[in-house]
Amino acid sequence: MARIAGIDIPREKRVEIALTYVYGIGLTRSKLILANTGVNPDTRVKDLSDGDVQKLRGATEEFTLEGDLRRKEGMALKRLQDIGCVRGRRHRMSLPVRGQRTRTNARTRRGSRKTVAGRKK
């Protein structure tokens, strides 16, 4: 397995797809990296030469990936919560942040239903 950005990428997959196993690299960024390095996207990871792997490592170093990216995103959310803005409060309460309705739906964000006892008449 080739290690890129501290992640072992799968040997049997095409390089274009295997790079997406690194947090912070999607398909678009993967294609950009391969175009810049001149590596064929259809090559399997196991068939890459050491030189190709070194090129890919060098190209990925210019991006914020893995732990640094997770930390950066976490700090952005923490900042929103600390300043007390609406988005931060919604994150803290585990509610949808971008204006979606919550009277019905929003089950993914709010979690499973909590049963409330009905009133007798």
Swiss-Prot record:
GO terms for molecular function: rRNA binding; structural constituent of ribosome; tRNA binding. It holds the Pfam family Ribosomal_S13. InterPro entries: Rbsml_uS13_C (IPR027437), Ribosomal_uS13 (IPR001892), Ribosomal_uS13-like_H2TH (IPR010979), Ribosomal_uS13_bac-type (IPR019980), Ribosomal_uS13_CS (IPR018269). Transmembrane segments: none annotated. Keywords: Ribonucleoprotein, Ribosomal protein, RNA-binding, rRNA-binding, tRNA-binding. Signal peptide: none annotated. One of its GO terms (cellular component) is small ribosomal subunit. One of its GO terms (biological process) is translation. Residues 100-121 have a biased composition (Basic residues). It comes from the Bacteria. Residues 91-121 are annotated as: Disordered. Gene3D superfamilies: 1.10.8.50, 30s ribosomal protein s13, domain 2 (4.10.910.10). Part of the 30S ribosomal subunit. Forms a loose heterodimer with protein S19. Forms two bridges to the 50S subunit in the 70S ribosome. HAMAP family: Ribosomal_uS13 (MF_01315). Located at the top of the head of the 30S subunit, it contacts several helices of the 16S rRNA. In the 70S ribosome it contacts the 23S rRNA (bridge B1a) and protein L5 of the 50S subunit (bridge B1b), connecting the 2 subunits; these bridges are implicated in subunit movement. Contacts the tRNAs in the A and P-sites. Belongs to the universal ribosomal protein uS13 family. This is Small ribosomal subunit protein uS13. It comes from Prochlorococcus marinus (strain AS9601). The lineage of its organism: Bacteria, Bacillati, Cyanobacteriota, Cyanophyceae, Synechococcales.
